[in-house]
Amino acid sequence: LACTSLGSKAVRIECALHTYLAVGDVDHISVSGLQGHEGEDFASGEKFVWRGEFVPSGECRKRFPRVSSAELHDKVWHRKIRLESTCGSGCFLWNPGSERCAGFADMEKDEYRRMFCIESTFAGDDAWRIKPGETRQLKMSLSEHPE
């Protein structure tokens, strides 16, 4: 993703590379690579330092501003998906959970169980400030490996 400021003033931009990853069952996944990193829960506004492996429970909207690589472990499909980002971007974890998913017109009521998002982002305090004529890039790669 590349953003260029074509105007005469600096602009502030938040961006994310969204991934809707298919998983065997959201109740049987975990995310590693977050240990010891500061994060924020967008649902509650709570800030925290993460300890251990992340296991989602219910609705998940968590941002880790200083995490540029992480791994999703899918225990049903016996695989891991590695996210790697460049440019010092953050990591956002998202799943709507059952209640929020039921309100989405474009998702089946139990579809949240078969997907999870692990995304590369620049948002909040880490949003880009792009000067006139400047271009900023966000790059992300995903790779799948047996586990």
Positions of PLM-derived features:
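Short, acidic/polar linear motifs in exposed loop/turn regions
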Residues: 6-9, 146
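Active-site/ligand-binding surface loops and adjacent short beta/alpha elements
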Residues: 10-92
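Short, well-ordered beta-strand segments enriched in hydrophobic/aromatic residues
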Residues: 1-5
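Anionic group-transfer/hydrolysis microenvironments
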Residues: 7, 20, 121
